[in-house]
């Protein structure tokens, strides 16, 4: 068996490193194993490990580990989930897996835990939601992937949007008029998640046809022409993205098909046919016309003869099942997009004033998804449904007026029906079951009180904690009118701006109607890290969140805690540092009842690094430096200035720092991409404030007082913080307790930690057993492990030492030294089959049987 090949095979497994080391050690000693047997053993080990993985709070015998709020490792999307990005001036949907894999292949990655993280040195942007409930293009800081062997959850909303993610992927919800993250596993039917209804765009004005066809063409840049190499007519290469071009593509999406040599469009409306003829004439192309009876209805075909145009249009799909929106369209000129949507609706759309609906159908889901995104360019929201054979896009009547103003129809019959629908709408009827704004708190009620607005009207919205956008807009309008009459300056009121922000938001808070578990058949799952609020948008328009990186003292984030057998092993091994060090910090009387004071202490304790205070840290290729963009709000929140940050950087690194507003440029002597990338992790970890080793602090109210929970431990430094109750504050790091509080405190900590661990698994063990273990571990004045390097290795009996671990080694060493085992203990006597030296086993008296028998005879 090739040891190097075996090591590589084991290193590629998705299991802990300690398990990999143990597996390699044991397999390398077995010389008679075939490759097939080795593979079988490896599969068994991996399967056993996966079965041992448990959900939070789930206990499996004594082996139960609680993994709560694991940041950045399990919060991911599957390969095929598309997200919307902007690269240069082009907006496009891309599979997240394809994007991340390409970036890692191109720029490499850093292994952080189980994740492969690639910090992007180039500018790619994601559509992101901010606290102002507006969407903006924000830079993607890094791409992330990691292996996943569990289930995925698929979420469907009332408007027909869908997203698939890992259960621990982070979404955002609206709570008390703020945007906050929440794990997917915590979402439930009835919750509302944001779906984009407006997309800001760059507006690409023109494209080169040569960028979208194969290499079998000749480009004449002087005359702006492109033509096939062998025969065929030329067309303009650089073509303006105007309304007419957009309309032609829209009609093609609805009614067109292509062959290798021509484009065919079928329709009977003379207005549409004239537009097609005009477009062909504009390009100088020949066309033919044919009456067509396809078995369903009479039609009329126009065939435009151009292999160049035909190949270009294949970017939009070639059949009804494969039609789609080409990538360049999403960032195209608004007039071009307007023309495309009108052309498509003229062909396939319909409107019914009586049913108050505008709709379009297609055999292609990808096309319907693309049209929905394009409608968002005009602030028009749509609903997706599916019939037995087709995908349907519905524009609610609330957006009919907007559709009439921005898009409209060219076909007279459809145009007049749309006008009839718009004129029939009643502005007073504002109920909308989809566009509801959740979790408004008491802001509307408080605002109404300021102008004596009838409380009974507003109280029901506070009770239900949701209100339709149009309804809220109507009430705000009336409150504004009352404020003018009563001389109240509502512009100075916080509640007014909170509600105004909700009304003018760029998202619909879409209700979840279905959540289901599905299998994951891919090796990796993926994520991206985005500047600001860390949100990005999927191709279905769902805004999602990548991590819980920001401060959450209200219990949004949680702490990792090792429980069960792994924790028991840590205790008896007397580990210098637990795998998940935590502290429970109690506060003094004047602090424990005041949340604000508790949060101040939390901020004083929590370690603040440059990575957590910066909007982004990236390589600036133009200046050959590391660019650090600081967040003024975060700096102010933690009581820091830019000068404080600069001073901290200079203490750790020898770099030249240029300052441009809130952006720092860190320059090294010999810059290169490799050298700059190597320094980024060090820069991210520069300590600015707080106690080293304490990564996060949570504030929770328990038993009538506020208690701090930390991820990380530093007992000595925490005791120095004013306001901390040192008589009750504890850590799960037993060695730290010994160093700070002494051996007696460490003994008590061992007992308490073991008892708590066992109780959490529902196991009852007499405390005297735990006390005995603690006494043995601390008897010599320092905490010693139960193992060959501690208590067990110090046993006087050779056989007792050999029975614990490394049998051959102990017996060989004892024989070499000539050790004698007096068989005084329990273990060694059991091994050799002798009575235990205990109780009657201690008696060494002998009896003279003959004497006893003779004595009895005399009597």
UniProtKB/Swiss-Prot annotation:
Primary subcellular site in the record, as a coarse category: cytoplasm
Subcellular location: Cytoplasm
Pfam families in alphabetical order: Intein_splicing (PF14890), LAGLIDADG_3 (PF14528), RNA_pol_Rpb1_5 (PF04998)
HAMAP family linked to this entry: RNApol_arch_Rpo1C
Origin: domain of life: Archaea
Cellular component GO terms held in the UniProt record: cytoplasm; DNA-directed RNA polymerase complex
Free-text function comment from the UniProt entry: DNA-dependent RNA polymerase (RNAP) catalyzes the transcription of DNA into RNA using the four ribonucleoside triphosphates as substrates. Forms part of the jaw domain.
Reactions performed catalytically: RNA(n) + a ribonucleoside 5'-triphosphate = RNA(n+1) + diphosphate
UniProt signal peptide: none
EC number of the protein: 2.7.7.6
PANTHER family per record: DNA-DIRECTED RNA POLYMERASE (PTHR19376), DNA-DIRECTED RNA POLYMERASE III SUBUNIT RPC1 (PTHR19376:SF32)
Keyword Coiled coil attached: no
Source organism of the structure: Methanocaldococcus jannaschii (strain ATCC 43067 / DSM 2661 / JAL-1 / JCM 10045 / NBRC 100440)
Protein name: DNA-directed RNA polymerase subunit Rpo1C
Family, similarity comment: Belongs to the RNA polymerase beta' chain family.
PTM field: This protein undergoes a protein self splicing that involves a post-translational excision of the intervening region (intein) followed by peptide ligation.
Keywords: Autocatalytic cleavage, Cytoplasm, DNA-binding, DNA-directed RNA polymerase, Endonuclease, Hydrolase, Intron homing, Nuclease, Nucleotidyltransferase, Protein splicing, Transcription, Transferase
UniProt-listed GO biological process terms: DNA-templated transcription; intein-mediated protein splicing; intron homing
GO MF annotations in UniProt: DNA binding; DNA-directed RNA polymerase activity; endonuclease activity
């Amino acid at each position: 068996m090739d040891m190097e090949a075996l090591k590589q095979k084991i290193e590629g497994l998705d299991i802990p490193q300690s398990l990999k080391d143990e597996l390699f050690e044991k397999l390398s000693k077995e010389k008679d194993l075939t490759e097939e047997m080795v593979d079988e053993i490896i599969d068994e080990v991996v399967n056993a490990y996966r079965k041992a993985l448990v959900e939070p709070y789930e206990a499996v015998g004594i082996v139960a580990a609680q993994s709560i709020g694991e940041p950045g490792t399990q919060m991911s999307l599957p390969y095929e989930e598309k997200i919307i990005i902007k690269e240069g001036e082009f907006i496009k949907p891309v599979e997240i897996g394809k994007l991340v894999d390409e970036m890692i292949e191109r720029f490499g990655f850093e292994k952080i835990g189980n994740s492969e993280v690639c910090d992007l040195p180039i500018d790619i942007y994601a559509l992101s939601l901010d606290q102002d409930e507006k969407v903006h293009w924000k830079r993607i800081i890094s791409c992330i992937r990691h292996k996943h062997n569990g289930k995925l959850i698929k979420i469907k909303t009332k408007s027909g949007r869908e997203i698939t993610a890992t259960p621990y992927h982070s979404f955002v919800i609206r709570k008390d008029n703020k945007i906050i993250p929440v794990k997917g596993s915590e979402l439930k039917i009835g919750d509302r998640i944001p779906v984009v209804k407006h997309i800001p765009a760059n507006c690409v004005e023109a494209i080169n046809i040569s960028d979208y066809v194969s290499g079998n063409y000749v480009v004449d840049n002087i005359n702006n022409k492109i033509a096939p190499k062998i025969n065929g007519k030329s067309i303009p290469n650089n073509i303006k993205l105007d309304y007419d071009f957009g309309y032609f593509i829209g009609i093609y999406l609805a009614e067109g098909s292509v062959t290798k040599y021509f484009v065919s469009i079928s329709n009977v409306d003379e207005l549409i046919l004239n537009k097609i003829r005009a477009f062909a004439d504009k390009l100088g192309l020949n066309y033919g016309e044919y009456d067509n009876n396809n078995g369903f209805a009479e039609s009329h075909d126009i065939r435009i003869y151009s292999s160049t145009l035909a190949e270009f249009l294949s970017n939009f799909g070639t059949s009804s099942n494969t039609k789609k929106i080409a990538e360049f369209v999403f960032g195209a000129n608004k007039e071009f997009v307007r023309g495309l949507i009108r052309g498509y609706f003229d062909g396939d759309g319909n409107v019914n004033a009586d049913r108050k609906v505008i709709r379009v159908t297609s055999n292609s889901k990808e096309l319907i998804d693309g049209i929905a995104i394009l409608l968002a360019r005009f602030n028009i929201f749509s609903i997706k449904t599916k019939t037995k054979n087709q995908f349907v896009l519905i524009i609610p009547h609330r957006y009919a007026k907007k559709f009439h103003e921005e898009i409209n129809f060219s076909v007279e019959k459809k145009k007049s029906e749309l006008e009839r629908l718009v004129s029939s709408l009643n502005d007073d009827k504002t109920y909308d079951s989809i566009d509801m704004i959740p979790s408004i708190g008491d802001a509307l009620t408080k605002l109404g009180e300021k102008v004596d607005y009838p409380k009974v009207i507003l109280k029901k919205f506070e009770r239900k904690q949701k209100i339709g956008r149009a309804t809220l807009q109507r009430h705000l309008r009336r409150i504004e009118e009352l404020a003018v009459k009563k001389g109240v300056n509502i512009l100075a009121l916080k509640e007014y701006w909170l509600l105004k922000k909700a009304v003018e938001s760029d998202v619909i808070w879409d209700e979840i109607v279905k959540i289901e578990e599905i299998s994951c058949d891919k090796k990796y799952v993926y994520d991206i890290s985005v500047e600001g609020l860390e949100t990005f948008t999927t191709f279905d328009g769902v805004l999602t969140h990548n991590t819980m990186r920001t401060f959450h003292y209200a219990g949004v984030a949680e702490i990792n805690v090792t429980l069960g057998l792994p924790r028991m092993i840590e205790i008896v091994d007397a580990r210098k540092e637990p795998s998940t060090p935590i502290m429970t910090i109690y506060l003094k009387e004047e602090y424990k009842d005041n949340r604000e004071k508790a949060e101040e202490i939390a901020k004083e304790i929590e370690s603040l690094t440059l990575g957590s205070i910066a909007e982004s840290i990236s390589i600036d290729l133009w200046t050959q430096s590391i660019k650090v963009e600081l967040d003024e709000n975060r700096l102010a929140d933690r009581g820091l200035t830019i000068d404080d940050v600069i001073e901290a950087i200079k203490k750790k690194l020898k770099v030249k720092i240029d300052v441009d507003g809130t952006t720092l440029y860190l320059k090294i002597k010999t810059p290169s991409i490799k050298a700059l990338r190597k320094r980024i992790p060090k820069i991210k970890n520069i300590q600015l404030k707080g106690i080293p080793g304490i990564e996060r602090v949570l504030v929770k109210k328990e038993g009538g007082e506020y208690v701090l929970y930390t991820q990380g431990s530093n007992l000595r430094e925490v005791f120095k913080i004013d306001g901390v109750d040192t008589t009750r504050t504890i850590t799960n790091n037993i060695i730290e307790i010994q160093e700070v509080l002494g051996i007696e405190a460490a003994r008590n900590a061992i007992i308490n930690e073991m008892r708590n661990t066992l109780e959490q698994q529902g196991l009852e063990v007499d405390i005297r057993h735990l006390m005995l273990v603690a006494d043995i571990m601390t008897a010599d004045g320092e905490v010693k492990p139960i193992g060959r390097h501690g208590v067990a290795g110090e046993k006087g009996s050779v056989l007792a030492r050999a029975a614990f671990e490394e049998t051959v080694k102990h017996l060989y060493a004892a024989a070499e030294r000539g050790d004698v085992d007096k068989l005084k203990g329990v273990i060694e006597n059991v091994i050799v089959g002798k009575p235990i030296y205990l109780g009657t086993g201690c008696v060494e008296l002998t009896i003279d049987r003959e004497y006893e028998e003779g004595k009895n005879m005399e009597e």
